[in-house]
Each structure stands twice: as C-alpha cells, then as structure tokens.
UniProtKB/Swiss-Prot annotation:
It is found in: Secreted. Belongs to the vitelline membrane family. Major early eggshell protein. It comes from Drosophila melanogaster (Fruit fly). Sulfated by pip; may be involved in embryo dorsal-ventral axis determination. Sulfation by pip may occur on covalently bound glycosaminoglycans. Disulfide bonds: none annotated. Residues 1-17 form the signal peptide. GO terms for molecular function: structural constituent of vitelline membrane. This is Vitelline membrane protein Vm32E. Residues 36-73 form the VM domain.
Length: 116
C-alpha cells in the first residue's frame, strides 16, 4: 500500500513539475442560487480541449419491420431431431459414392502417370 501511495505521489509531483506555472485562481465568490459546483477554466495546453466539437450523426434509413426477429441480422441456427432410417441410408450412400469417386480418380491418375 505504501508503494502505491509513493508511486502516486511521484506521478503527481512529475505532472505538477511539467505543467507551466498558472496564475492563481481568483477568489471564490459564491453563486446566488445555483446547485452544483462551477466548472474549472479550460486549460489550453491539453491535447484535447474541454469543449468538444460535437455534431449529431445523420439518421440512417428506418429499418423494415422484422417481426419477432427484432434487429438481429444473423441467421438463427435451426436444429433438427435425429434422422430417420431413410435419411441415414441416403447419407451413407452419398459418402460411399464420394469415396468411390475419389478412389477411381486416384486410379486414373496412377494409370496416366505410368509409362509403357
């Protein structure tokens, strides 16, 4: 804890030493009936000034109604139940046919590469 406090004091001392001397603030005069605290004067030696130059962004075109989907643009994944017997047979046939085609392509390339 002491190291943190010591480091903080060192940073404050360095920051205070690097800032140019500013004239002391005028004596405080209490406002008549305002609530809150008055803002300090804006320094001129900061990279960003206190008064940002803000402008409202132009509005985009109004989005069409999406119903219950709201503003989501991603497709919601649709999970299905386990496949029936016919779907499994079709899947295995397709996998088998794809493997057979790859095997035949490999044989065709092997035959073409041989010299007689």
């Amino acid at each position: 804890m002491q190291i943190v406090a010591l480091t903080l004091v060192a940073f404050v001392a360095i920051a205070g030493a690097s800032c140019p001397y500013a004239a002391p603030a005028p004596a405080y005069s209490a406002p008549a009936a305002s609530s809150g605290y008055p803002a300090p004067p804006c320094p001129t030696n900061y990279l960003f000034s206190c008064q940002p130059n803000l402008a409202p962004a132009p509005c985009a075109q109004e989005a069409p109604a999406y119903g219950s989907a709201g503003a989501y643009t991603e497709q919601v994944p649709h999970y299905v139940g386990s496949p029936n017997r016919e779907q499994l047979q079709q899947f295995h046939q397709r996998i088998g046919m794809a493997a057979l085609m790859e095997e035949l392509r490999g044989l065709g390339q092997g035959i073409q590469g041989q010299q007689y």
